[in-house]
From Swiss-Prot:
Functional pathway: Amino-acid biosynthesis; L-leucine biosynthesis; L-leucine from 3-methyl-2-oxobutanoate: step 2/4
CDD domains assigned to the protein according to its UniProt record, in alphabetical order: IPMI_Swivel (cd01577)
Its EC number(s): 4.2.1.33
Record's protein name: 3-isopropylmalate dehydratase small subunit
A Pfam family hit: Aconitase_C
Annotated GO biological process: L-leucine biosynthetic process
Length: 165
């Protein structure tokens, strides 16, 4: 799975409360979640994010309370992938379960800047910055996790398996 987009960059410890504030948890409407995604940390996020953009962040992305709304808001906003130095484990699992591609990459914030064009090969764990001639290696997901993401999430993967059974 290959993705390409411009970078929206954030620091360490971006928690689920700023990804989608608790005041919007009374809905699971993807469009509504997208409108309020990241608004407490980046009030202009909804107006500047473009389909295919990639979030790059520091350590412990998605920490805080467990809520599937957080990766759903990011995915619904049009973000194609989140690359972070590390993820909170519950966000990591929720992202995979809803089909949001994520990639862990040590020191990625030292090499990628806001607005950079990034190409990601999830199958190989490769990150390329073609305008800067930079290539970064990370650890790819195991194949079964890649299949879940490619299917659009765990539920879609299970539905697909039932159809072929």
């Amino acid at each position: 799975m290959k993705l390409k987009g411009r970078v929206l960059k954030y620091g360490d410890n971006v928690d689920t409360d700023v990804i989608i504030p608790a005041r919007y948890l009374n809905t699971s409407n993807p469009d509504e979640l997208a409108r309020h995604c990241m608004e407490d940390i980046d009030p202009d996020f909804a107006s500047k994010v473009k389909d295919g953009d990639i979030i790059v962040a520091g350590k412990n992305f998605g920490s805080g309370s467990s809520r599937e709304h957080a990766p759903l808001a990011i995915k619904s906003a049009g973000v194609s992938c989140v690359i972070a130095e590390s993820f909170a484990r519950i966000f990591y699992r929720n992202a995979i379960n809803i089909g949001l591609p994520i990639l862990e990459c040590k020191d990625v914030t030292d090499r990628i800047e806001e607005g950079d064009l990034v190409e990601v090969d999830l199958n190989e764990g490769k990150i390329k910055l073609p305008e800067k001639n930079i290539n970064i290696d990370s650890t790819p997901f195991p194949s079964f996790m890649q299949e879940i993401i490619k299917a659009g999430g765990l539920i879609e993967k299970i539905k697909g398996g039932i159809k072929h059974a």
